[in-house]
Amino acid sequence: MIAQSVLQACVNLGVREFVVCAGSRNSVLVHGLLHHRDQVELYSFFEERSAAFFALGRTLAQPYPVAIITTSGTAAAELLPAVIEAHYQERPLVMITADRPIRYRGSGAPQAIEQSELFSVYAETYD
């Protein structure tokens, strides 16, 4: 339900393109995009940093925001260089990242990093 609400909010805000780096933790988001397939364009990438810069490039070519969806942990961290560029170029880049439960942080569990403030300096809003 949360995933569908997030995706619907993006569509309502004008996102028409989603760049996806599929992973196990963001699979519900990727699956949720199927409900919007007639409204949006999807691009699939294997590597997050390249995907983020592709999404940034799409914001330069389109008059609307572009969203990128990744799994958790270092996959989300790979977006940071493009997020910084988007910030300084004032481009509407939307990052949607999966996350592990809070109890896994600091436990040594894979892909369990502190994501809550990862983009905060360079993002207009962050929740």
Per-region residue spans from a language model:
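N-terminal alpha/beta PP-like core and its mobile active-site loop of ThDP/TPP-dependent enzymes
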Residues: 1-127
